[in-house]
Regions:
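Residues at the starts of beta-strands that form the adenosine-phosphate
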Residues: 32-34, 56, 120-121
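Adenine-nucleotide cofactor-binding loop residues
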Residues: 40-42, 65, 87, 105
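Short, conserved SAM-binding/catalytic segment
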Residues: 47-54
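N-terminal Rossmann NAD(P)H-binding glycine-rich loop of SDR-like oxidoreductase domains
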Residues: 8-29
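Conserved Rossmann-fold NAD(P)-dependent oxidoreductase catalytic core, especially the SDR/UDP-sugar
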Residues: 79-82, 86-145
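Conserved glycine-rich Rossmann-like NAD(P)H-binding loop of the short-chain dehydrogenase/reductase
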Residues: 30-46
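Conserved Rossmann-fold cofactor-binding substructure of NAD(P)-dependent oxidoreductases
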Residues: 57-79
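A short, basic/flexible loop-to-alpha-helix module at the beginning of a structural domain
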Residues: 1-7
Length: 149
C-alpha cells in the first residue's frame, strides 16, 4: 500500500457512498491534493460540505466514459483510486449496456490514462459480487478486475 502523505490523489466516484468515505480518510492521511472526480455535481457538493471545504480538495465533474475528460483529471496524480461504478444490482439488470459502459469501458479508460501518464499506483474498488458473478453488475465488476490486473 502506497503512502498517501504529501501525494496528489485522484478518486473517481468521489461523491458516492464508498468514494466519499475514501476521500474523508485520505484527507486525514495528509494528502497534498485530493482530486474528487464524479459525474454528479450534487454528489460533489455534498462531499464538499462533508469535508468542510478542505482547501486541498478539488472537485472535478466528469464521466469515466469520457476518455479525454478522465485523462485531464489523471494529470499529475501520484495515486488513483477507482471507485466510480454502477453498483446497484437491480439497476444494472435493467440497464446492462449502461453497466458495461461505466464499469468495463470506464475502467479501461482509466487504466489507459494511468498508463499514458505513468501513474505509479492505481487501486480498484470492487465487490464480492465479482467472484463467481450471478448478475450483470457482478459480471461487469469481474471484467473490471481483469482489466486492472
Amino acid at each position: 500500500m502506497p503512502s498517501f502523505n504529501n501525494k496528489i490523489v485522484l478518486v473517481t466516484g468521489a461523491g458516492g457512498s464508498i468514494g466519499s468515505e475514501i476521500c474523508k480518510k485520505l484527507l486525514s492521511l495528509g494528502v497534498h491534493r485530493l482530486k474528487c472526480f464524479d459525474i454528479s455535481e450534487y454528489s460533489l457538493y455534498r462531499l464538499s460540505q462533508k469535508i468542510e471545504n478542505d482547501e486541498r480538495a478539488r472537485f472535478l465533474i466528469g464521466d469515466v466514459r469520457d476518455k479525454e475528460r478522465l485523462e485531464r483529471a489523471v494529470v499529475d496524480a501520484d495515486i488513483v483510486i477507482h471507485a466510480a461504478a454502477l453498483k446497484h444490482v437491480k439497476f444494472c439488470e435493467f440497464n446492462p449496456d449502461e453497466a458495461f459502459k461505466t464499469n468495463v469501458n470506464g475502467t479501461q479508460n482509466l487504466v489507459d490514462a494511468c498508463r499514458k501518464l505513468d501513474v505509479k499506483h492505481a487501486i480498484l474498488i470492487s465487490t464480492d459480487k465479482a467472484a463467481r458473478p450471478q448478475s450483470v453488475m457482478g459480471t461487469t465488476k469481474s471484467l473490471a478486475e481483469k482489466i486492472f490486473i
